[in-house]
């Protein structure tokens, strides 16, 4: 009977010793046993002879290597770790002494450095960015050149030099007046198309007034536009458009034309069986010896 009264063996659950049927240790109110408190290391007290050895090595170098620390530790009968900690504390003490010396050398008012006064946003004049500046400075420094007289040679050079070769001289006033084509001369031969040399188009003023001019072949195509416009036809070669000034309004060009419109200028042929003959000019830059190549039959 006494065997049943004795408590059973101890069981360990999660490293906790349980005594038989008792489960009081598993209750929430019972805390787990805490780790033992780490003991504080005792402070090391250095003797005068030990301090002399350490100070002598510190005077040589503030960062001794492990071999120098072990050698000193053997002399003063201390572990190497204590020597390492002593050098660490000695360097910190040396830095603190240097900072105190710097503070003593500075004057009393030198510690508080005078800061520059901050400028207020409204006091300083700042350039306004509302208006974009002129990058080319046209509004201040540029002045347009004065327009020359209508009959000045410089204007003629600016007008005619675009179309004339570089080897030719500017046309005088008398020749510029001949550039304007007359109405009857352009409409006299509506079906004849003559190819003149390129030099005649640039230099010869008579080429624009003769039936064999460069633009005589364009007349049949330009004249039928007159009834559609409801007024006189516009002429690209009329009046002052080739003269001194090219800047004319469309209203000033509306009254200039080749001449009176005639039914002869239409595109319809009077004789459907007729042929169109292209007159060959020996001055043509295209060297075609066979003139029969310039004739064709309209079917």
Swiss-Prot record:
Top-level taxonomic group: Eukaryota
Location(s), subcellular: Nucleus
Positions of region (Disordered): 93-155
Keyword field: Activator, Cone-rod dystrophy, Developmental protein, Differentiation, Disease variant, DNA-binding, Homeobox, Leber congenital amaurosis, Neurogenesis, Nucleus, Retinitis pigmentosa, Sensory transduction, Transcription, Transcription regulation, Vision
Any Pfam family the entry gives: TF_Otx
GO biological process: animal organ morphogenesis; cell differentiation; nervous system development; positive regulation of transcription by RNA polymerase II; regulation of DNA-templated transcription; regulation of transcription by RNA polymerase II; retina development in camera-type eye; visual perception
SMART domains for the chain: HOX
DNA-binding region, residues: 39-98
GO MF term list: chromatin binding; DNA-binding transcription activator activity; DNA-binding transcription activator activity, RNA polymerase II-specific; DNA-binding transcription factor activity; DNA-binding transcription factor activity, RNA polymerase II-specific; leucine zipper domain binding; nuclear receptor binding; RNA polymerase II cis-regulatory region sequence-specific DNA binding
Tissues where this protein is expressed: Retina.
Effect on the protein of changing residue 115 to Q: In RP; uncertain significance
GO cellular component entries: chromatin; nucleus; RNA polymerase II transcription regulator complex
InterPro entries: HD, Homeobox_CS, Homeodomain-like_sf, Otx_TF_C
rRNA processing listed as a keyword: no
Keyword Membrane: no
Mutagenesis / variant outcome for changing residue 88 to N: In LCA7; reduces NRL transactivation and reduces steady state levels of CRX and NRL; altered localization to the cytoplasm
Effect of residue 90 to W: In LCA7; reduced DNA-binding ability, transcriptional synergy and interaction with NRL
Principal location listed in the UniProt entry: nucleus
Family of this protein: Belongs to the paired homeobox family.
Disease: Leber congenital amaurosis 7: A severe dystrophy of the retina, typically becoming evident in the first years of life. Visual function is usually poor and often accompanied by nystagmus, sluggish or near-absent pupillary responses, photophobia, high hyperopia and keratoconus.
Physiological role: Transcription factor that binds and transactivates the sequence 5'-TAATC[CA]-3' which is found upstream of several photoreceptor-specific genes, including the opsin genes. Acts synergistically with other transcription factors, such as NRL, RORB and RAX, to regulate photoreceptor cell-specific gene transcription. Essential for the maintenance of mammalian photoreceptors.
PANTHER family: CONE-ROD HOMEOBOX PROTEIN, HOMEOBOX PROTEIN
Complexes and interactors: Interacts (via the homeobox) with NRL (via the leucine-zipper domain). Interacts with PDC, RAX2, RORB and SCA7.
The name this protein goes by in its record: Cone-rod homeobox protein
Originating organism: Homo sapiens
Gene of this entry: CRX
């Amino acid at each position: 009977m006494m065997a049943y009264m004795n408590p059973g063996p101890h069981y360990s659950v999660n490293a906790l010793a349980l005594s038989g049927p008792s489960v009081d240790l598993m209750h929430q109110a019972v805390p787990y046993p805490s780790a033992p408190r780490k003991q504080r290391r005792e402070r090391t007290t250095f003797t005068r002879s030990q301090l002399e050895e350490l100070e002598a090595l510190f005077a040589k170098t503030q960062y001794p290597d492990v071999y120098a620390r072990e050698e000193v530790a053997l002399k003063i009968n201390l572990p190497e770790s204590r020597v390492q900690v002593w050098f660490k504390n000695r360097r910190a003490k040396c830095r603190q002494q240097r900072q105190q010396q710097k503070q003593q050398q500075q004057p009393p008012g030198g510690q508080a450095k005078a800061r520059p006064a901050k400028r207020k946003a409204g006091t300083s004049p700042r350039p306004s960015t509302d208006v974009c500046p002129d990058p080319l400075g046209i509004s201040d420094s540029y002045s347009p050149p004065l327009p020359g007289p209508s009959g000045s040679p410089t204007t003629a050079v600016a007008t005619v030099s675009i179309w004339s070769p570089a080897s030719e001289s500017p046309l005088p006033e008398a020749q510029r007046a001949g550039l304007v084509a007359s109405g009857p001369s352009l409409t006299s031969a509506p079906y004849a198309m003559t190819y003149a040399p390129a030099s005649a188009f640039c230099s010869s003023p008579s080429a624009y007034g003769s039936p064999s001019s460069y633009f005589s072949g364009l007349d049949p195509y330009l004249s039928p536009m007159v009834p559609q416009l409801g007024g006189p036809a516009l002429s690209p070669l009329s009046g002052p458009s080739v003269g001194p000034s090219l800047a004319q309004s469309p209203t000033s060009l509306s009254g200039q034309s080749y001449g009176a419109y005639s039914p002869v200028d239409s595109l319809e042929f009077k004789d459907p069986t007729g042929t169109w003959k292209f007159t060959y000019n020996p001055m043509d830059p295209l060297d075609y010896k066979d003139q029969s190549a310039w004739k064709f039959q309209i079917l």
